[in-house]
């Protein structure tokens, strides 16, 4: 079943509007939506209850209500989830977390970034990378750092739609492609 992107965007914008500028509420909601989305993707029973036309609306709302209570989702946000279930568009739950995070980042002019290196990186170098990219992109970047030994050396830096791959692995792949052209 295809996700209705217009409906998804409407729900996300409504959530952000009712939550306002409260960064803590937005962050907690984002985390709860991550868990809800993961539950939807991984638990076929939950997904079947939400999507099944044979399950009554009352049963769907009861099941969703129990889950939302466990996730400590703000009261203001719950009606939007129930609206999706009522309109038979419960499948938006699988993409709700990404769309919500994207709109929150846009709202606060922040971007999630990732630095992947072959070896540990010190804070000083990370801050230099962050400063350069923030000036280039014009937004605040929140980095997560990962290690991947398969890179051999160098780094892969991702921030929003910006990707910079300076890894030795990538260099070797490019070299291989250029040598096999002849």
From Swiss-Prot:
Pfam families: OSCP. InterPro entries: ATP_synth_OSCP/delta_N_sf, ATPase_OSCP/dsu. It is found in: Cell inner membrane. Keywords: ATP synthesis, Cell inner membrane, Cell membrane, CF(1), Hydrogen ion transport, Ion transport, Membrane, Transport. One of its GO terms (cellular component) is proton-transporting ATP synthase complex. Its main location: membrane. HAMAP family: ATP_synth_delta_bact. Belongs to the ATPase delta chain family. F(1)F(0) ATP synthase produces ATP from ADP in the presence of a proton or sodium gradient. F-type ATPases consist of two structural domains, F(1) containing the extramembraneous catalytic core and F(0) containing the membrane proton channel, linked together by a central stalk and a peripheral stalk. During catalysis, ATP synthesis in the catalytic domain of F(1) is coupled via a rotary mechanism of the central stalk subunits to proton translocation. This is ATP synthase subunit delta.
